[in-house]
Amino acid sequence: EWMTGMGALYVQEAVPEVATIFTTHATSIGRSIAGNNKPLYDYLFAYNGDQMAQELNMQSKHSIEKQTAHYVDCFTTVSEITNNECKELLDKPADVILMNGFEDDFVPKGSTFTGKRKRARTLMLNVANKLLGTNLGDDTLIVGTSGRYEFKNKGIDVFLESLNSLNRDTNLHK
């Protein structure tokens, strides 16, 4: 999110009649604190965002993000916990909290879901076959992850270790 900050600040300066909004799903310094195995939420109240940015060599990203949060017309975030992170690390609570999540009807129901799942599986196997230069069977187990790649914060380390454990399990037949 911090990457949009310069644009938002520029628009605010160059075209002040255009309203600016900045939404963060997590602060860059918060991600860095957690990614460096420091306890983010246990000690959130004790962290100084500017000091942590210096310690973790994140001054540029943090500075842009902090200035953007303070100077856009509307600063938003996606949860109460992220708002607490913004208050502590950016010295600015969100103007509005836009709750994260999906509507109940986001996932299709019944035969619509089954059809979409089958088509998606066929496409994934097709891509895998082309990438690997092989012909994987229809019963191939497909395991995947999506989203932002953050080795610790998003649990990629746990995901890979779990796959390794499954791979070594002699009781599994797939």
Residue ranges and their predicted role:
Residues 1-174:
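Catalytic cores of nucleotide-sugar-dependent glycosyltransferases that transfer UDP/GDP/TDP-activated
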